Amino acid sequence: MKVISSIHELRDQLRGQNRTAFVPTMGNLHEGHLSLMRLARQHGDPVVASIFVNRLQFGPNEDFDKYPRTMEADIEKLQKENVYVLFAPTEKDLYPEPQEYRVHPPHDLGDILEGEFRPGFFQGVCTVVMKLMSCVQPRVAVFGKKDYQQLMIVRRMCNQFALPTDIIAAETVRDADGLALSSRNRYLQAAERAEAPRLAAELNQVREAVLGGERDFAKIERAAMAALAARGWQPDYIAVRKRSNLLPPGPEDANAELVVLAAARLGATRLIDNLEI
């Protein structure tokens, strides 16, 4: 596996490749990330991964400085997955001058849910993804369903800019107790880690209520948030939405068209999760 930081060198290395499969990450790789690499290999060759902790998507009071950086361990894991190239640019490599041009997702998708609680987050995500796509020029790119809203926004962005890249969605990987894998799980204290699967459990409760015929979505959302709050969580949202556009559903929308999404803070750690209904 070649580890490359220069955009020029990356393009030289990939010249002539027309079936490249790309997996962008921020590093601190876990089994969820590695499953993306394996799925990428099913859809293209060679597989290119990137590691870049993107300052543009972190708010002023978020965890950019303490976000876990484990490059040596990450390289070892990617080598075992037979990744062809790891693109690991520095900030100066990717942003040699101030990034004055940004990609702004539409308000109806970028300023709700995660976008409401993390202003500017999706602008930062779209900007770095657009730049990485320009560098790698992949045939396919793999994004996890764990970041459901991000997946939708990136897919729509690629469609509307006519990028020649198909976006492949990967299923969420979970620990045996149901907790969705995340680099931020390492922030959890022992007692918090034991409590953390409750978020997925509440999503399952919402799912079961909807499948059982409940159509008062606001009622079951409030109940789930109250249940988390009673256990010491600080929920930002639990929301049943339409998969197609993340708008609130009506009673006529079929269950198979819905997803429930959640974000909540447990101690100092903010966790997100979702479950398709």
From Swiss-Prot:
- Residues that coordinate or bind (R)-pantoate: 57, 150
Q: Which InterPro entries match?
A: Cyt_trans-like, Pantoate_ligase, Pantoate_ligase_C, Rossmann-like_a/b/a_fold
Q: Spell out the Gene3D superfamilies in the cross-references.
A: HUPs, Pantoate-beta-alanine ligase, C-terminal domain
Chief location of this protein? cytoplasm
GO MF annotation list: ATP binding; pantoate-beta-alanine ligase activity
Give, as one word, the top-level EC class. Answer: ligase
Q: Which residues participate directly in catalysis?
A: 33 (proton donor)
Q: What EC number(s) has UniProt assigned to this enzyme?
A: 6.3.2.1
From the Swiss-Prot or TrEMBL record, state where the protein is found: Cytoplasm
- Annotated GO CC locations: cytosol
- Which reaction is recorded as catalysed by this protein? (R)-pantoate + beta-alanine + ATP = (R)-pantothenate + AMP + diphosphate + H(+)
Q: To which pathway does this protein belong?
A: Cofactor biosynthesis; (R)-pantothenate biosynthesis; (R)-pantothenate from (R)-pantoate and beta-alanine: step 1/1
Where along this sequence does the record place binding of beta-alanine? 57
Report the record's Gene Ontology biological process terms.
pantothenate biosynthetic process
| One Pfam family of this chain | Pantoate_ligase
Instruction: Provide the alphabetized UniProt keywords.
Output: ATP-binding, Cytoplasm, Ligase, Nucleotide-binding, Pantothenate biosynthesis
Give binding positions for ATP: 26-33, 144-147, 173, 181-184
The record, for HAMAP family, names: PanC (MF_00158)
Any further remarks? The reaction proceeds by a bi uni uni bi ping pong mechanism.
Query: What function does the entry list?
Result: Catalyzes the condensation of pantoate with beta-alanine in an ATP-dependent reaction via a pantoyl-adenylate intermediate.
Oligomeric state and interaction partners are given as: Homodimer.
Q: Which protein family is it in?
A: Belongs to the pantothenate synthetase family.
Task: Please state what the protein is called.
Answer: Pantothenate synthetase
Q: Whose protein is this, by species?
A: Paraburkholderia xenovorans (strain LB400)
| Primary gene name | panC
